Amino acid sequence: MKKIFLLAIILLVGGCGQKIQSVPPIPLPNKTFAETFDTDIYFDATVSMRGFTTNPTNNVYVTLPDLLGDLCGNAGAVNFFGFGEQIFELNGRSYRQFTTPEVYVEAITSVANVVERADTSHLSIIVTDLFESDADWSFVTKKIREKFFAAHLTVAVVGIRNSFAGEIFDVGLSAAKFNYNSFDDPNRYRPFYLLILGRDDAVKNFLRKFNERQTLPNDTGYFLLTENLSDADFSTFELSEVENFYSDDTLQLDGRIKEFGLDNFADAASFMVNWTYEPPIGACPIDFAQVETLAEIFSVDGENWLPREQNDVRAALLKDDRQSDLFLAKVSLTPEKSLSEGKANFVRIKISPTENGLRLPAWVEAWSVNVDGAIKNFDGSKTINLSRLLGSLKNSQFETSRPKLLEINFVVAP
């Protein structure tokens, strides 16, 4: 009985130590990754695509029906469709007919109709030559912006230069027909494209697997528009040159969030971290002189986190000359100007490229041609106005969402 009484006293005394404070759930977006999802693959069945099937040399295009089905089949069901102006389902193994010229009979193509039909819970892959008028493509980008970018989904384009012998339509101001043969010259190969739309993890995973499965020597370009240019996890970073912050765990947050206390509320506080930029496949080149910081601070008020109207948080990326992809990120703030004294404060910092700081990949410009109306100026190894088409797609992302390079989240305990 005495031992039990003594244990009760010890537990009571131990419970009278430092009080664990509780805070509402941290306002972070939930990252959900579905293990399975369906894939919808759409083949452009217009006559201008026929030429990709006629020359067997280094022909990636004729491998696509089986290759795409194989790459996507492990994640869930794979559904095949053909399209011109309308969309039609391909039952059974009829999708394999798209390796032969005979099925390419459609006169009009409408990528916009495919985007409108696309199921945002699926991965959608559109196989096309991106031969769209400015007006048609403007409608496509509008649909993608409203349906995918506004829903925080990801869009990618894969370009593959392929042997080609056939007709190309609507060339120049006179909308002329153009006969083109690449023969067996890789420098004359004509590009076709995969337009890929869906959840961020699904799109990035597809790009990785497609890149790994590329065995032919055909030139291939990748273009990715994602809100997450880096998967770096700040909670795992080692801090250096820490001023007026100390590690704290009185709030007992989960491992995703770093927690700090302040030595003195009246003094400036700062820290630095090393960060290595590891871009995903297809990420646009970045001008690191054109990045900007968005800082938000939320203070606990009862059961809620309320945003503070003003703060002086500063975050700077400093280039480390020892390695091209290595940076120092310095974060600083003045507690009296940024934090609510005596309350828990959640600090969310996003470092993002500006619209001009996110550049088109070099291959996009190299594969693009402008035709001023003279058919003689057309180059069948390139795509008309490709840089303008993909540039407008990039710009449309910035109208609804901002891609981030690095996100730094931490809580300052009272």
Across the structure, where does each feature detected by a protein language model lie?
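Sec-dependent N-terminal signal peptides
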Residues: 4-13
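Extracytoplasmic/secreted cell-surface and envelope-processing proteins
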Residues: 20-24, 49-54, 87-93, 132-141, ...
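Von Willebrand factor
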Residues: 77-125, 132-136, 159-168
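Extended non-globular C-terminal regions
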Residues: 240-414
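Positively charged n-region of N-terminal signal peptides that target proteins for export
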Residues: 1-4, 18
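Acidic, polar low-complexity linker/tail segments
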Residues: 16-40, 47-51, 406-414
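Eukaryote-biased recognition of electropositive, low-complexity segments
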Residues: 156-278, 283
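…and closely analogous acidic/polar surface helices at protein-protein or active-site interfaces
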Residues: 27-29, 36-37, 47-77, 139-151
